[in-house]
Amino acid sequence: MPLNLLKTYNSLLELDSFSESERNISLGRIFHRDFIETDNFFRNKAVKPTPQEGKTTIEILFHHLTTHSEGKYHHRVYDRDRSMRIHWIKFHLQEKKADTIEVFSVKDKQAVRTYIYNEKESYIVVLEPKTPQYYYLITAFYIKGRNRYKIEKKRNRKLEGIY
């Protein structure tokens, strides 16, 4: 399990041989290192977990970054592709390979969202600017299926600046 802590971008975490409990411990260690032990920033703005009334924001963020919504009632289930790339989020927030990512903002139905899009790796980090000082980390995921077309539509509607 500790070997996953040594993984860097763009390697994938090794999770398939773990039981659910072992997998959660391994992912939890990486999450703790990347989101609890250190503060995150994107372009000099703090990146915070999205609050949800009555719940611990860090636990919600961990659950959201390792699961996806499924079915009519949007029940969340383990997402192997998201989980194997959880350590990619910090790398993208830091824009370590700026030449491989595109950053753009789009006005969606609810709010303006800022996207950090890595087309080569089919990966995206979604932020919501809340104030001039910070963003909420909405989600991050491996893009597959119809999501690729959704992202392309968003790119075509991108705003002039980055919010």
Question: Each PLM stretch: what is its role?
Answer:
Residues 1-163:
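Ribonuclease/tRNase effector modules and their secretory precursors
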